[in-house]
């Protein structure tokens, strides 16, 4: 397929607008992708988004979007708890898929999607493609070459994302595109920082180090309710989870997702070895994130825009469809991270360390 890929944007909330519509409506990508459709169940939202960003068609139902012959692929920008069912429907409709994180809530759901997609020849890219960042590849190369010595331990995590979502520009306005209710971030299924943002940390950590083997955890809720425009949000999903991962060979990593208290830099891990350490993106005095670094498609105006990593992952899917180039932002890596999150909650609930049942193939040194 060499013509532009018709993209259907599933959900016109914060990530649908900032990650998909703003990027895919720019002139520099029209030779490769086109905005074929957008859907959202909120009255008037899909229509408003289509008018603002020049989308060919708009729907209030996902089924309507999937039935549109102009849609070749979907980018799923809906709440995480809907991803599995929407992915399944896309596969059944013969549409290629980009999943915003996380692809599913359980590893079993991910298994099912991977199997069904393979059977039907469907391409699936699953965000976040953190190993598309050049600095992460440099860090992995240091690890594989033994520059850090024997690995001792690592730490990564994030904090405060709940407050961030309450204050996004898409929550503070009065119209249909800027008054998007954030309740799902704090509720089951799919809410909480683990599925929402710790996933970035875990993709970095496992992309650099390879798959983990076991996990144990403690988890709970610090903030039981929030207020959105005078409306009370009752939270029923844990907002603070602390995990300990076992990578084998006595190498462990501490991973946190909490309401407050960041001890690391961004989503980057600190990795400590017997001969040296990578702290964030620095190896000693050497900065591993260079000024001209960018993901393959994040150039021109995209480089200065928010959610450029989401745009990159969508373009990875377009390249796969058009040129037959599979992406490192693959479903198998996403499944392993989901396995870690799911097993972490299970470990916290049972008080028992959980053995992970999934794996993936990390980048070999010759690909770095």
Provide a role label for each language-model segment.
Residues 1-4, 9, 73-75, 319-368:
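C-terminal helix-rich "cap/oligomerization" subdomain common to oxidoreductases
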Residues 1-53:
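N-terminal Rossmann-like dinucleotide-binding module
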Residues 53-116:
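Beta-loop-alpha module in the N-terminal Rossmann-like domain of NAD(P)-dependent dehydrogenases
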Residues 99, 124-126, 155, 255, ...:
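Hydrophobic residues in well-ordered beta-strands that form the structural core
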Residues 112-130, 148-154:
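Rossmann-fold dehydrogenase core element
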Residues 130-233, 351:
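Predominantly a Rossmann-like dinucleotide-binding segment in NAD(P)-dependent oxidoreductases
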Residues 173-174, 196-197, 201-285, 311-327, ...:
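Contiguous beta-strand/loop segments that form the cofactor/metal-binding neighborhood of enzyme cores
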